[in-house]
Amino acid sequence: MIKGVIFDMDGLMFDTERIWATLWKPALATLGLPYKEGLDAAARGSAGDSMRAVLRRFYGPDCDTDAIMDALHAQAETAFQAPPPKKPGLDELIAYLEAQHIPMVVASSSRMASILRHLNNWHMTDHFKALISGEQFTSSKPDPEIFLTAAKALGTTPAETLVLEDSYNGVRAGARGGFFTVMVPDLAPADDEMRRLYTAECKDLREVKKMLEEGELLSEA
């Protein structure tokens, strides 16, 4: 059975991806750069070198990637002063996992300050055994390193660990790491690539809880 659960944060726990999508244009404008169509989708779920690679693809090899990322996070500081809404079923799923004594971690591409802000605003930090940020790694999702580190924090192997993700890059990371990966789509629906990679798809976190209760999420799958 599943012995540990890894939660992504943006778009999975909290309804933040829609807000992030609106921040690119004003962030780039502060640097005199235009927003290029498709940037938000390409960057979603990435950080560090993975994000830098996306930015270079859109703005050329000589663009100041750190300045762009800093401008984006400066916009986020204002946008996320108020707690973002929790995704449906989050509280119920966490309560179920705690009742089953299944440990949980958050592994997000976001900066640690952002992770702490959202969790603290909702008084949720104590539910998780560890909080892991993409800024801790040179390579972020779709590289599986962040999830492999999370599994070590849980004391589980990838095969007995459930990864919950909404983004394409997150699903890619889970699959590459050998995790039991469930996609809960947010802004982008599952495509053929995602259906080849994920173990299962759920419409929301309530459905994840139901599948766990009914024994449908087995590590042997």
Predicted regions and their residues:
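N-terminal helical cap/lid subdomain that shapes the substrate entry/recognition surface
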Residues: 2-100
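Asp-based, Mg2+/Mn2+-dependent phosphohydrolase catalytic module
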Residues: 1-3, 95-98, 111-221
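Short, flexible loop segments at the rims of nucleotide/cofactor-binding pockets, characterized by
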Residues: 80-85, 109, 178-179
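Residue-level marker of regulatory loop/turn positions in helix-turn-helix DNA-binding domains and
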Residues: 86, 107, 139
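Structural motif
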Residues: 42, 107-109, 164
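Functionally critical, cavity-lining and gating residues within the transmembrane helices
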Residues: 48, 108, 112
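Residue-level detector of anion-binding/catalytic polar loops
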Residues: 34, 103, 180
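Conserved G/P- and acidic residue-centered "switch" motifs that form tight phosphate/ATP-binding loops
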Residues: 8, 12, 108, 166
